[in-house]
């Protein structure tokens, strides 16, 4: 169908309750899994080859803080300005990865459990801010406007994905209680990273499990039998400098 306007909403989350419940469950899952780590397991490698668990704890703290900044400055935040370029997803991924790496390297030295505690407070405070501004624009990617609610959906998906990362690091399985809400959050908040063909909500035949679709869209499992690379090479390169600095800090603490 031909569009008669220059923008559209990204699969809007018209009802806040399901995604906010799933968001809260994602925060809780991260905290519960983090409580199972000890000094040795915090040093274990996560499914993202260039991040160990203690680095992921710091990243979570940074992301929660960034969400507040983006909301404060929406729709002209630095994240909104980046998305407004309409750049290819790979280009956006490289820029976001460099930002993540720089923030992680600059993070104050603290035990991983302390980072998780700050993350929990910040993430829950963010959710409490959303009700009154749910339908307002947060940013735009190409011709798609993402609302504040859509960005909350993206955050919801990120929390569950990182819970999966922590669980796999511990050698246990993880699956959200409401994968459909997580999938809806991804669709609403991540138009620059579309779902794999054949996943629920994609245009092709619907056959993939909702949670597997999110894992595939995020690069954690292959999108297809032909795609065996779970982590893009550009992400590994972007994270390398911060990884080295963080590991020097870790050695200094020992």
Which residues make up each language-model segment?
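Helical hydrophobic small-molecule/effector-binding pocket
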Residues: 94-98, 125-134
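HAMP-domain connector/hinge
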Residues: 45-49
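Structured surface interface patches that mediate subunit assembly and partner/cofactor docking
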Residues: 2-21, 26, 40-44, 69-85, ...
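Flexible "arm" and connector segments at domain edges
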Residues: 97-104, 127, 163, 170
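Primarily hydrophobic membrane-targeting regions of prokaryotic envelope proteins
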Residues: 27-30, 51-67, 126, 159-166
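Conserved alpha-helical segments that form or flank metal/cofactor-binding pockets of metalloenzymes
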Residues: 54-98
């Amino acid at each position: 169908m031909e569009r008669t306007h220059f923008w559209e909403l990204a699969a809007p989350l018209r009802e806040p309750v399901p995604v906010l419940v799933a968001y809260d469950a994602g925060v809780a899952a991260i905290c519960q899994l983090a409580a199972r780590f000890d000094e040795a397991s915090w040093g274990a490698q996560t499914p993202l080859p260039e991040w160990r668990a203690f680095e992921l704890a710091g990243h979570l703290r940074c992301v929660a803080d960034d969400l507040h900044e983006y909301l404060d400055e929406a729709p002209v935040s630095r994240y909104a300005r980046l998305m407004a370029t309409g750049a290819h997803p790979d280009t956006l991924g490289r820029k976001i990865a460099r930002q993540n790496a720089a923030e992680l390297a600059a993070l104050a030295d603290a035990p991983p459990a302390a980072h998780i505690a700050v993350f929990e407070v910040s993430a829950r405070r963010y959710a409490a801010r959303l009700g009154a501004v749910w339908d307002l624009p947060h940013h735009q990617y190409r011709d798609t406007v993402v609302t504040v609610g859509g960005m909350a959906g993206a955050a919801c998906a990120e929390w569950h994905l990182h819970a999966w990362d922590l669980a796999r690091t511990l050698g246990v399985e993880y699956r959200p209680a409401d994968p459909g809400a997580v999938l809806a959050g991804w669709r609403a908040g991540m138009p620059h990273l579309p779902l794999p063909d054949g996943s629920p909500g994609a245009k092709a035949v619907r056959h993939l499990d909702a949670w597997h679709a999110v894992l595939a869209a995020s690069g954690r499992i292959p999108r297809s039998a032909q795609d065996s690379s779970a982590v893009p090479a550009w992400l590994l390169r972007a994270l390398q400098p911060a990884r080295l600095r963080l590991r020097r800090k870790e050695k200094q603490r020992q």
